[in-house]
Regions:
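Acidic/aromatic-lined carbohydrate-recognition and catalytic surfaces
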Residues: 2-186, 190, 203-260
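Hydrophobic residues within beta-strands of alpha/beta enzymes
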Residues: 48, 196-198
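Noncatalytic carbohydrate-binding groove/subsite architecture in carbohydrate-active enzymes
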Residues: 256-292
Length: 292
């Protein structure tokens, strides 16, 4: 049986902002990482998982991406990134990029266009709904507090944001969204990266109709059961594998809150052709009571 390199690799996450500052501006950067590659290699690290370095207004530490194919100025340039990849491969180390495609920044060009009008060609790249009786479309709460819906007066509708109001959710039911995401992934893979860590990837498929959570509680409540491991999640990940991932010798891991060990097998079984691994959080709650 042929060995798969990712099963035997030691992976180290680098949060670039706090890792190593090469120019004394108080912010870690790509050149700082390059300067420590020999040290990281000596520690026995095979793969670096690089937290987001894409262009971003930085509302959520880079997880609000305004351009997937540019590097945030604070971290350096694309030339610096190219040098990092080259120097890593020279040391027989591999680079895994963070893939954040449940949502973008509200400063991404897709969203800027989307909010201009209801008939804009990018409108359905995001999840827009009219209000109900002067309120939000449903009672879902956002991970960062408050409603998961933000009213936008330009078109008198609300957009869904499961996280920050500056992180509108992409509409994965729109095939054009999926194809644009796949093209972006190919951009980085053709540059030579060795894998993706996929941020909250099991949130991308929402239940049809976006139903409200049935509860006696007032205010905003978790809508997880209506978007976590949603109805088309396996269809979309299989499609991603078929169109992109299977064409490269890479490592893939999905961050998946709320996935049980049995459900994890559905995402990672080789015969299912989706992902190779998941971050599974069930064990984190073993000593938690009803209130957390």
């Amino acid at each position: 049986m042929e060995k798969q390199w990712w099963k035997e690799s030691v992976v180290y996450q680098i949060y670039p902002r706090s890792f190593m500052d090469s120019n004394s501006d108080g912010i870690g950067d790509l050149q700082g990482i390059i300067s420590k590659l020999d040290y990281l290699k000596e520690l026995g690290i095979d793969v670096i998982w690089l937290s987001p370095v894409y262009e971003s207004p930085n509302d959520d530490n880079g997880y609000d991406i305004s351009d997937y194919c540019k590097i945030m100025n604070e971290f350096g340039t694309m030339e610096d990134w190219d040098e990092l990849l080259h120097e890593m491969h020279e040391r027989n180390m591999k680079l895994m990029m963070d893939l954040v495609v449940n949502h973008t920044s509200d400063e991404h060009n897709w969203f800027i266009e989307s909010r201009k009008s209801k008939d804009n060609k990018y409108r359905d790249y995001y999840i827009w709904r009219p209000g109900k009786e002067g309120k939000e479309p449903n009672n879902w709460g956002a991970a960062f507090s408050g409603s998961a819906w933000k009213y936008d007066e330009m078109t008198d509708e609300y957009y869904l944001h499961l996280f920050s109001k500056k992180q509108p959710d992409l509409n994965w039911d729109n095939e054009k969204v999926r194809q644009d995401v796949y093209e972006m992934m190919k951009f980085w893979l053709e540059k030579g990266i060795d894998g993706f860590r996929m941020d909250v990837i099991n949130f991308i498929s929402k239940e049809e109709g976006l139903p409200a959570v049935e509860t006696e509680a007032e205010g905003y409540v978790s809508g997880h059961k209506h978007f976590m491991n949603g109805p088309n999640i396996h269809k979309y990940l299989h499609e991603m594998n078929e169109e992109v991932l299977s064409h490269y010798d890479i490592m893939t891991v999905g961050e998946m809150p709320g996935v049980t060990t049995e459900e994890a097998k559905l995402y990672t079984g080789e015969e299912r052709k989706e992902l190779q691994m998941v971050f599974q959080f069930e064990h984190m709650d073993l000593d938690s009571g009803e209130g957390g």
